[in-house]
From Swiss-Prot:
Pathway: Amino-acid biosynthesis; L-histidine biosynthesis; L-histidine from 5-phospho-alpha-D-ribose 1-diphosphate: step 4/9. It holds the Pfam family His_biosynth. Keywords: Amino-acid biosynthesis, Cytoplasm, Histidine biosynthesis, Isomerase. The active site is at D8, D129. This is 1-(5-phosphoribosyl)-5-[(5-phosphoribosylamino)methylideneamino] imidazole-4-carboxamide isomerase. GO terms for molecular function: 1-(5-phosphoribosyl)-5-[(5-phosphoribosylamino)methylideneamino]imidazole-4-carboxamide isomerase activity; imidazoleglycerol-phosphate synthase activity. It comes from the Bacteria. The keyword Metal-binding does not apply. GO terms for cellular component: cytoplasm. Belongs to the HisA/HisF family. It is an enzyme of class 5 (isomerase).
Length: 242
């Protein structure tokens, strides 16, 4: 299982939200490039970045910082937040992003997902952010009536290979992930599932690994010191090729 440390960008700084609430944001680092380098030094093989300004406005706002991170760390980066059209996807993949995450756009525009998957295959991921099992969009400000499992199955039919699942009620809380919903999703589809939201300690990561999930995104637990990234990667990868 791969562990993806998270960088959430707002106005060029690393911040963390609580339950997806932009008003409850806290700056955790002034220099995202320094943070990314530290993640790499601690053994990260992949980094998860969200452009929170982009998620709110519908267009990428922190591209210069993101480009600098890619050039500096030289390990794969996946990016979400404000990606709403194929031109933006083209631009990001051209800039060196390894995997582009579509969230709101995937729910509002199935045609875009089809086009993107046809062109970029596994470089496209779908971010499914759920509240009470319903898919949320527009920076988590709006909750749809669509069930997260139904949506995941629909994305899989289109050809999506990677799904990032976040239970919003758990995100940034350090109260543990929603293992029940995660397991239900992982058993319902054949895509690579990446767990996100609420992971508080190494035991949570072990619980996710037992489900044979592809990956886990860890944010607040690293910044708060609850999880030592280097130790976590070693423990999770011990005796396992996945």
């Amino acid at each position: 299982m791969i562990i993806l440390p998270a960088i959430d960008l707002k106005e060029g700084k690393c911040i963390r939200l609580y339950q997806g609430d932009f008003k409850a944001s806290k700056v955790v680092a002034e220099d995202p490039i320094e943070v990314a380098l530290k993640f790499k030094e601690n053994g990260a093989e992949y980094i998860h970045i969200v452009d929170l300004d982009g998620a709110l406005t519908g267009e990428i706002k922190n591209l210069s910082i993101i480009s600098s991170i890619i050039k500096t760390i030289n390990i794969p980066v996946e990016l979400g937040g404000g990606i709403r059209n194929l031109n933006t996807i083209d631009m990001l993949i051209g800039a060196g992003i390894e995997r582009v995450i579509l969230g709101t756009a995937a729910l509002n525009n199935r045609g875009l997902v089809e086009e993107a998957v046809k062109k970029y295959d596994e470089k496209i991921a779908i971010g499914i952010d759920a509240k009470n099992e319903k898919v949320a969009i527009n920076g988590w400000l709006n909750v749809s009536s669509i069930n997260y499992i139904d949506f995941a199955k629909e994305m899989e039919k289109i050809g999506v290979r990677n799904i990032i699942f976040t239970d919003i009620s758990k995100d940034g809380t350090l109260k543990g992930p929603n293992l029940k919903q995660l397991e239900k999703l992982n058993e319902s589809i054949n895509c690579n599932v990446i767990a996100s939201g609420g992971i508080k300690d190494i035991e949570d990561l072990k619980g996710i690994k037992e489900m044979d999930v592809y990956g886990a995104i860890v944010g607040k637990a690293i910044y708060s010191g609850n999880i030592n990234l280097n130790e976590a990667i070693k423990i999770i990868n011990k005796g396992s090729s996945k």
